[in-house]
Amino acid sequence: MDSTTSPYGTFYNEKFATADLRSYRKKGPNPWTRTLIEALKAEGVEGATLLDIGGGIGVIQHELLASGAARATGVETSSAYLAAAREESDRRGHTGRVTYQHGDFVELAESVPAADIVTLDRVINVYPDWARLVGLSAARARRLYGVIVPRDTRFVRLVIVAMNLVLRLQRQRVRAAVVPLDAIDRVVREAGLSLCFSRTVGPAWQVVLYRRD
């Protein structure tokens, strides 16, 4: 799915990518992403392969490669984010250890290889067919499957309703949603993975990690 036709590729443009990259270089990973990274490192990432779906500027890729992961694959609909991820990868000396695929993971899934670790950082909540996304991505995880999703609280739901209203008024096609964690859990367990870590970070985010049985 090309960024010129994908609502995600169009919405997450160069302005977003530049701001995210600047923030990452100045402050490092945000608290929720850092929590997932630390949980993955606690399980062991040395020599591991990573599949990072919708990873934006590639924060998880950069951090795990710096911590001993062998290789990473980034699948992203936004060409602006892919360019920023490549730029940061080159700057960190990771060129040759990262493969990039431009498009919708669900559409590309058959051509995307499995990896020891699969991550989706704030992706499930903005993808229309979340169950298919989770099912296909969980099946690619040989060892660990980590996701970050909005907490299922009244406050978060109200924020998302307001955000979607603004997006509608701006004529954007991107929408967000709160997907109940137990619904995600059922799909992930069907793929043969079990919960090994769960933590709330701030008022909005839930960080969850699964391990293959």
Can you describe what each PLM-predicted range is?
Residues 85-86:
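Conserved SAM-binding loop
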Residues 57-68:
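Conserved SAM-binding loop of SAM-dependent methyltransferases across substrates and taxa
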